Design a protein with these regions (language model features):
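C-terminal membrane-anchoring or membrane-association module
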Residues: 231-245
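Short, threonine-centered small-residue motifs that mark membrane-proximal processing/anchoring sites
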Residues: 4-28, 203-229
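Mature extracellular "passenger" or substrate-interacting domains of secreted, surface-exposed proteins
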Residues: 26-213
Length: 245
């Protein structure tokens, strides 16, 4: 029994170590990012997916001077993101122009078609919803610290594909927005207050999170062998104790 124990315990430790090694998260490389706007709610006069330099825009509203809207410019690819560390997904732009009441969007969807190196599946489509509160530009302003002229609009977001994951080296990952930032991601906040009467940019940050690990079959087999050996040893000890009694 001592000999078997000496053989089994190393097997268990080796299996555990192997699974631990397989579970070590590595940097993830994104090789393509293509944005698409869709699903606008409320308002009128939509123009979808207009190219504007590096930005892809959605515009809305009956303008007094120019339409309002949002634009997104994804981070240049290829780029690498480390799991559980905030990274810049791209820049969000708000065209905050005076438009006729009742013609503003209340929400729009942003789809991001990405290619993830060495992932299964490699091609991913992530979806995010942006909620837009276009204020009436009348004092008192709805949000504090509003600019002059009043009043700031507020943009928030929702992740729509939190249950979607891709797998690299036996580890499942999910991608989710975590906030807006103007300081390179040192701090993030869940909303973007956009100054009235201007074009305002802000960084949009996300995070890769490790989901349920998928151990490799060989690791599971080795661990199972070790556990089976321990059970056998335990049963033999129980039988020996019974005979001695």
């Amino acid at each position: 029994m001592k000999t078997l124990s000496k053989l089994v315990w190393p097997a268990v430790f080796a299996a555990s170590a192997l699974i631990s090694i397989n579970a070590s998260a590595a940097p993830v490389s994104f090789t393509a990012n293509t944005p698409t706007w869709s699903g606008a709610v409320g308002g009128s006069d939509y123009v979808y997916n207009a190219a504007n330099g590096g930005f892809t825009d959605i515009r809305w509203g009956t303008p007094l001077s120019a339409p309002s809207g949002l634009g997104f410019n994804p981070t240049d690819t290829p780029f690498v993101a480390n799991p559980n560390v905030a990274f810049k997904l791209g820049d969000l732009r708000h065209y905050n122009n005076p438009i006729t009441a009742g013609t503003a969007a209340t929400s729009v969807n942003l789809g991001l078609a990405t290619t993830v190196a060495d992932a299964a599946p490699a091609n991913q489509n992530f979806s995010f919803q942006f909620l837009i509160d276009e204020t009436t530009n009348q004092q008192p302003c709805k949000y504090p610290n509003s600019s002059t002229p009043p009043c700031d609009d507020r943009i928030t977001f929702q992740n729509m594909t939190l249950n979607q994951f891709f797998t690299i080296a036996g580890i499942n990952y999910t991608l989710a927005l975590i906030g807006f930032s103007n300081d390179g991601g040192a701090t993030t906040q869940s909303y973007f207050d956009s100054q009235e009467g201007g074009t305002n940019n802000i960084g949009l940050y996300a995070r890769l999170t490790e989901a349920t690990q998928v151990p490799e079959p060989g690791s599971l087999a080795l661990l199972g062998l070790g556990l089976a050996g321990l059970v056998a040893i335990s049963r033999r000890k129980q039988k020996s104790s019974g005979l001695a009694a």
